[in-house]
Curated annotation (Swiss-Prot):
It comes from Saccharomyces cerevisiae (strain ATCC 204508 / S288c) (Baker's yeast). Disulfide bonds: none annotated. Residues 119-174 form a coiled coil. The active site is at residues 289, 297, 328. CDD domains: tRNA-intron_lyase_C. Belongs to the tRNA-intron endonuclease family. Changing residue 292 to E: In the cold-sensitive allele sen2-3; defective in cleavage only at the 5'-splice site of tRNA precursors. The tRNA splicing endonuclease complex is present with 100 molecules/cell. Present with 319 molecules/cell in log phase SD medium. This is tRNA-splicing endonuclease subunit SEN2.
Length: 377
């Protein structure tokens, strides 16, 4: 089965709550079929049998974590919620470490002869790491050739000599890049061989029976946790309990303002079908994916602001340069509060989150960096 089909099957649902899709076939001209269909519809439910358990770790900085392996994968596979603490995003540390230490006896290939999903992910992570190293090597090689050209110019070289040297350098860089591409697979195989050797510190990862300790957990952003308990009844805590963990009961509006604004933005894009992930990697609040990280790169970087806040040009230009360098679109998301601060904090303390979040209005502006050489019209 191809990678695309595997992902389509694995990430079938965009949210942890699934639609009711086990209803019987409806025969239009048969009244009994209508009655049976209505009965099954009335009895069906899409509520989770066992809600996801979360733990709160830390005093000064609160970490909201999910410890159970199955629940971690469930949240990731159904909406890409959370981040593995020892992984890039999906919590794959356990599978990667078991494979490296030879603890997993499950065959890595399925009946079709293709690689399993776990092995594919491990290979991709290794390839990504290797490509980062190769990019550094390529930059060093390019800088070396640029120094040669600079030396020629300092010596007063003729223009024809420069052209000949430039052509040689371009050809040298092409061959260097081609060699790097061929070396990716070889290096990955060498890593597989070298990683099979146990290190001294690996003994600390195993319990008395030789099984891998469950060290990795899935960490949720506060806004993700609120969404999974307020918008969707997925977590085993209530919105009021979560709010009490995040802020003290006597909190002022200025204490909760940043969180409320961030959640309003998060809920806004989730409700429009976007997969929302943390954007700290690109200096913004959120990244927006059409489906999720396994399918394509994020298209938009979102920065949340109050509707009456204006930054200087340097602030906008700095973020736009980072976002533009990653080939993404920069979105300024302005949030306006429609009620007073006193009313907002009163709604928060009374746990009336529905009315509180509905009292904010969201507006968006696409920011595009103006380049004189490209924007002449």
């Amino acid at each position: 089965m191809s990678k695309g089909r595997v992902n389509q099957k694995r990430y079938k649902y965009p949210l942890p709550i699934h639609p009711v899709d086990d209803l019987p076939e409806l025969i239009l001209h048969n009244p009994l079929s209508w009655l049976y269909w209505a009965y099954r519809y009335y009895k069906s439910t899409n509520a989770l049998n066992d809600k996801v358990h979360v733990d709160f770790i830390g005093d000064t900085t609160l970490h909201i974590t999910v410890q159970d392996d199955k629940q971690m994968l469930y949240l990731w596979n159904n909406g890409f919620f959370g981040t593995g603490q020892f992984s890039r995003s999906e919590p794959t540390w356990k599978a990667r470490t078991e494979a490296r230490l030879g603890l997993n006896d499950t065959p890595l290939h399925n009946r079709g002869g293709t690689k399993s999903n776990t092995e594919t992910e491990m290979t991709l992570e290794k390839v990504t790491q290797q490509r980062r190293l190769q990019r550094l090597e390529f930059k060093k090689e390019r800088a070396k050739l640029e120094r040669e050209l600079l030396e020629l110019r300092k010596k007063g070289g003729h223009i024809d000599e420069e052209n000949i040297l430039l052509e040689k350098q371009r050809e040298s860089l092409r061959k260097f890049k081609l060699k790097q591409t061929e070396d990716v697979g070889i290096v990955a195989q060498q890593q597989d061989i070298s990683e099979s050797n146990l290190r001294d510190e690996d003994n600390n990862l195993l319990d008395e029976n030789g099984d891998l300790l469950p060290l990795e957990s899935l960490e949720l952003m506060p806004v993700e946790a609120m969404f999974l308990t307020f918008a969707l009844p997925v977590l085993d805590i209530s919105p009021a309990c979560l709010a009490g963990k995040l802020f003290q009961f006597d909190a002022k509006y200025k204490d909760i303002h940043s969180f409320v604004r961030s959640y309003v933005i998060y809920h806004h894009y989730r409700s429009h079908g976007w997969c929302v992930r943390s954007g700290i990697k690109f200096g913004c609040d959120y990244l927006l994916y059409k489906r999720g990280p396994p399918f394509q790169h994020a298209e938009f970087c979102v920065m949340g602001l109050d509707h009456d806040v204006s930054k200087d040009y340097t602030w906008y230009s700095s973020i736009a340069r980072v976002v533009g360098g990653a080939k993404k679109t920069f979105v300024l998301c302005y949030v306006e509060r429609l009620i007073s601060e006193q009313e907002a904090i009163a709604l928060w303390k009374s746990n009336n989150f529905t009315k509180l979040f509905n009292s904010f209005q969201v507006g968006e502006v696409l920011y595009k960096r103006w380049v004189p050489g490209r924007n002449r019209d």
